[in-house]
């Protein structure tokens, strides 16, 4: 069994979701198989063994406090929000009112963006466009980024058997009727 840092496991999980078109964007059905921006990032870290959802992270507005309680540090003053300089793989970038993404390195981020209709809910399950959840170049968000959070327990590892397939959710709130 391979050992992987929690940072790498969170990034790998988010990338697997972005690269699997059975997962799309939806704010109503957001805990799998579809995700919105915050549930994607929260789920990636929860799957990596960092209990951010358990500690109360549920949307962009309360992510920061839950992530800080789980070993993240606010490194906003150490990075350039306009260019992305100083960011590291796994950094969580947040605008507390609107959006969140994860920095994956080399000037790239993984993000859940919008559904196939250009809306936040009401689309079909899965990624219809290949752009609902995707990897893209880092950008300075139109409303500005509020903070960058970095997981500082980098020596913490977790066993993994497969870095790709996320577990299916059994939460009833995720089932479309």
Located regions from the model:
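Catalytic Cys-His active-site segments of thiol-dependent hydrolases/isopeptidases
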Residues: 54, 102-136
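Short, well-ordered loop/turn sites that connect or cap secondary structure elements
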Residues: 81, 85-88
């Amino acid at each position: 069994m391979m050992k992987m840092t929690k940072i790498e496991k969170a990034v790998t999980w988010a990338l697997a979701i972005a690269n699997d078109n059975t997962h799309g964007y939806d704010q109503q059905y957001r805990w799998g198989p579809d995700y919105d921006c915050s549930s994607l990032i929260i789920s990636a870290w929860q799957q990596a063994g960092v209990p951010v959802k358990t500690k109360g992270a549920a949307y962009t507005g309360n992510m920061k406090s839950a992530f800080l309680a789980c070993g993240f540090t606010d490194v906003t003053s150490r990075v350039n929000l306009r260019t992305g300089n100083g960011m590291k793989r796994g950094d969580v970038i947040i605008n507390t009112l609107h959006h969140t993404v994860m920095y994956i390195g080399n000037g790239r981020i993984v993000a859940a963006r919008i559904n196939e209709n250009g809306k936040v809910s009401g689309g079909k399950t899965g990624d219809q466009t290949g752009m609902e959840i995707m990897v893209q170049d880092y950008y300075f968000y139109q409303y500005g980024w509020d903070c960058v959070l970095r997981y500082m327990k980098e020596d913490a590892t977790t066993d993994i058997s497969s870095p790709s397939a996320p577990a299916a959710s059994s939460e009833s709130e995720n089932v479309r009727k």
